[in-house]
């Protein structure tokens, strides 16, 4: 057993690790923002995270496509950011310095045919948010087209439990994880059938995680771990008669 003196360095390491993540999230950084998807935001549905209908996924219209410098090959799907129009840099901000919190749901790809400062807004290494129009119009005037912003990563507030949409076929389960609170970013996942042990899953693309086990006829449990190290276990969230194409959720498993 560790003595009190021996425990202190270990506890300090944990606190420093947690602080490093929290402090990084709380520091505002500069970027630019545009908008897409139409006035009703319908053009933002789907996207490179694989969420499909963003209402069903728990994310709604306040979303954005991230430049590749922020998107990180899909690893940042589900992250939440507070975005504020930078009134010191432009006259096109809405009065009052309004901020909006959005969820990362898509990739804004590079456009190498255009210069980075004239149309190629999402070209690396630019940090850029292509926001849904409804989200954009909370902070900036429509006619502006593009504005400088300040952003910082913030915790995600979600209603209800985490959702697991299962697609695939025998020996291949592709699970899309949505409505994730806390940091919002899934870093690791594991799956367990009622007749198996825990098996690590791998990210296939976006928010889609895969397993190559035959799990038909078994209830399914999942461990979801976020990029801040927090994790939850959703025991038997999918019953033994689960089927491909269905979404399963819990009201009690959330960050």
From Swiss-Prot:
Task: Give the matching PROSITE patterns.
Answer: EXPANSIN_CBD, EXPANSIN_EG45
Location in or out of the cell = Secreted, Cell wall; Membrane
Q: Does the keyword Secreted apply?
A: yes
* Covalent S-S links between cysteines: 49-77, 80-156, 85-93
Membrane topology label:
Peripheral membrane protein
This protein's UniProt keywords: Cell wall, Cell wall biogenesis/degradation, Disulfide bond, Membrane, Secreted, Signal
Tell me which positions the record assigns to the signal sequence: 1-28
Keyword Nucleus in the entry? The reply is: no
Sorted alphabetically, which SUPFAM superfamilies does this protein's record hold? Answer: Barwin-like endoglucanases (SSF50685), PHL pollen allergen (SSF49590)
Domain Expansin-like CBD residues, every copy = 171-250
- Which InterPro entries does the entry mention? Expan_Lol_pI, Expansin, Expansin/allergen_DPBB_dom, Expansin_CBD, Expansin_CBD_sf, RlpA-like_DPBB, RlpA-like_sf
Residue ranges of every copy of the Expansin-like EG45 domain listed in the record? 46-161
- What tissue specificity does the UniProt entry give? Expressed in the epidermis and vascular cylinder of the root tip, lateral root primordia, adventitious root primordia, shoot apex and leaf primordia.
Primary location group: secreted
GO cellular component terms, semicolon-separated? extracellular region; membrane
Function of this protein?
May cause loosening and extension of plant cell walls by disrupting non-covalent bonding between cellulose microfibrils and matrix glucans. No enzymatic activity has been found. May be required for rapid internodal elongation in deepwater rice during submergence.
Which family does the UniProt entry place this protein in? Belongs to the expansin family. Expansin A subfamily.
Q: What is this protein called?
A: Expansin-A3
Q: Which organism is it from?
A: Oryza sativa subsp. japonica
């Amino acid at each position: 057993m560790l003595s009190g003196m021996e425990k202190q360095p270990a506890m300090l390491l944990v606190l420093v690790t947690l602080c490093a993540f929290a402090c990084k999230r709380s520091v505002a950084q500069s970027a630019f923002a545009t908008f897409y998807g139409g006035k009703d935001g319908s053009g933002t549905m789907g996207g490179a995270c694989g969420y499909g209908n963003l209402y069903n996924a728990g994310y709604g219209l306040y979303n954005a496509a991230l430049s590749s410098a922020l998107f990180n090959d899909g690893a940042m799907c589900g992250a939440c950011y507070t975005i504020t129009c930078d009134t010191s840099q432009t006259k096109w901000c809405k009065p009052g310095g309004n901020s909006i919190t959005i969820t990362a749901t898509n990739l804004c790809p590079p456009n190498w045919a255009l210069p980075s400062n004239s149309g190629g807004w999402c070209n690396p290494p630019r940090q850029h948010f292509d926001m849904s129009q409804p989200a954009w119009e909370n902070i900036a005037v429509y006619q502006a087209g593009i504005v400088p912003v300040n952003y910082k990563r913030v915790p995600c507030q979600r209603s209800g439990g985490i959702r697991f949409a299962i697609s695939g076929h025998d020996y291949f389960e592709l699970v899309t994880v949505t409505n994730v609170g806390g940091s919002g970013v899934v870093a690791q996942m594991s799956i367990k059938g009622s007749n198996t042990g825990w098996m690590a899953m791998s990210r296939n693309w976006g928010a889609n995680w895969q397993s190559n086990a035959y799990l038909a006829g078994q209830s399914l449990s999942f461990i979801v771990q976020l990029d801040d190290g927090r994790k939850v276990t959703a025991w038997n969230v999918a019953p033994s008669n689960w089927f491909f194409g269905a979404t399963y959720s819990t009201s009690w498993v959330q960050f």
